[in-house]
Amino acid sequence: PSGVITDGLGFMYNGCMAVFDPRPGRAGSIAPGKARFSSLCPTLAFKDGQLRLAIGAPGGTQIAMGVTQAIINVIDHDMSMTEAVSAPRFSSTSNLIDVTNRIPRYVQAELEADGYQVFRKPNTFDIAAVHGIRVTEEGWLDGGADPGHDGVAIGV
């Protein structure tokens, strides 16, 4: 978020002007009436017609990467929702691979040895702020909120 609130409106503006290209005449340049792209991806996942997962995140260009990794953690690695949203994440929205500070340094070294450019983020939770609720096979609600950000996941 931008941290900017207009008196009387009661909401905070987003901070996505940063994703525009400041150079004129390019596809992502700032121009009157031009909308920015959106990486919003609120997601509902079903199994045999039953809701099993509701998940989403704020986080600008990092949203899709964060949400995707948390979904993979739940479905493929059988993690609880708290484990899934707390696991280390990476992102690659350009030629650079961004890794959070909790990705082991040997992983970064192996990627760099293979010719990838890697940027280590100084923060431990810096790729989207994923929150979700998993519905277990027994019908229990299992919520998880990214521990690096404000928020809570509550099933009612």
Where are these regions (language model features)?
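Proteins synthesized as precursors that undergo proteolytic processing into mature forms
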Residues: P1-T124
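Cofactor-centric catalytic regions
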Residues: R102-V156
